[in-house]
Each structure stands twice: as C-alpha cells, then as structure tokens.
C-alpha cells in the first residue's frame, strides 16, 4: 500500500462524540492522528462551547481537513424511515435545513475549509418526476452557495447505486460537486461491490470515509457496522484502487456504532498501518 495513505488519515469528529474542543483534542491525541474532519453543526448550534476551536487546534497542532453538516429530522430506525426522512428530501424540514446550511457555508468559509460533505438523501431516478426536479433544485442551490465561497461539496455514498449517483452528478454538472466515498455504506445499504463503485465514481472523488461493515442477509434491512478490518470491505483492493486512480485526497476514519469508538479508531489506524 502507498505509504502516503497513512499520512493522509484523519478522524471524523462526530465519531468521538466530544463534549467540547478540549475533549476532541484529547481523544485525537490518544488515537495518534492529528487531522480531523469537523462536524459544523455543533459549532453553529453552540458557539459559546466551540468558539476557541481554531486557537486550540493551532496550539495542539491539529489540522481540519474538511467539514460535514447534517440535516434535521432524519430517522435511521429502518431503511424505509431514512428513505422518507433523510437529507434534504422532506419538505417539512427543508426551510429550516436550508437556513442552517447557509449558516454552515459561512462557518466553513471562516474555517478556511475547501471541502464539506453531507448526506443528500435518497436521490430520485426518473428525470420527469416532480421529486427529481425538486431535488435537483435543492442540491444546485446548496452546491452553488458553497461554490460561491470557493468550497467543494461531497455527497456521502451508499443510499443509491454508484451508477445512479453517477447519473445524478452528471445531470447536476457542477465542478465543485463530487463524492465522499464510503465503502462500508455500499455494504450497509446493500448497493453493490464497494470497489466497483469506487471505480465508477472515481472521476468525482473528493474524499473517502473509512469504516467497515457486514452485509445484511435480509434484503431491505441494514447491514452491520463493525471495527475496520473485521468486515467485508477488501481493504487491500480498496487502497490499491485508490493508488491506481492516483487519488491524493484525505481518508477520514469514521465509527458510528459501538461504545469504544476511540479504541476502535485506534485499531483502525493500526490496521491500515499494517497494510503498508
């Protein structure tokens, strides 16, 4: 494996569920990675807690590689519930989500970020459907708002096949819009082979999330997230494919399950190092 991959590792801040910037710094230091993808929503919602983050990170030699924002009202109870409530699809939460997104764009610019990622929600596939036009309009508004500030956006992957996402990205046709590729999500959502999906979406690749999963045995149900290196993602093929593609972006370790996330991310770092 290309040794530069280890130098481009980062940690997703929300995986660590930090109470404040000092807690985040302490956990990053215990993991042994000083690069982070930062969740923007806590900073926007609790500025009195997070307003010293830039200064503290500078003192601690921690680099923010990118940002992430979420959307209100998401229900991950079942595959069907997240299809209805995920991302910017629901009309009931759109106005408030749009206000929050605009504020997050300002915040991202203040943090000198060049990339922000998000879950758009399940994308419609029929171009003549009203839902397609609605989603196209909303995504273009979001993309252009960040683009006006010199910021790229990355779709989180997994909620549709790579071919469907490629078609939507082609239709959107925005140079600052691409993909934050997560191989485990392709497994969790049962949307095809992660490596083939990576090849399909390669031209739009902005960043990768690194986590692992086991595919469901019951179609329509979730797969199961597991510690990186213990699931079904073929990591040697994954990193080999990135090397073939000459990918130079960041690789952010994410852990969204379990009660030992700091330890699990440390294991992930060690596993990735063992592949070199």
What are these regions (language model features)?
Residues 1-109, 174, 269-276:
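N-terminal pre-domain/capping segments
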Residues 7-13, 36-38, 64-69, 116-118, ...:
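Hydrophobic faces of well-ordered beta-strands that scaffold small-molecule active sites
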Residues 13-21, 39-51, 73-75, 123-128, ...:
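Acidic-and-aromatic substrate-binding clefts and catalytic sites of carbohydrate-active enzymes
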Residues 20-23, 75-178:
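Active-site acidic/histidine proton-transfer and metal-coordination neighborhood
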Residues 35-36, 67, 136-232, 239:
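Acidic/histidine-rich catalytic cores of soluble enzymes
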Residues 45-48, 52, 84-99, 127-138, ...:
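Alpha-helix N-cap and loop-to-helix initiation/capping positions
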Residues 231-238, 243-251:
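H/E-rich (His + Asp/Glu) clusters that bind or coordinate divalent metals
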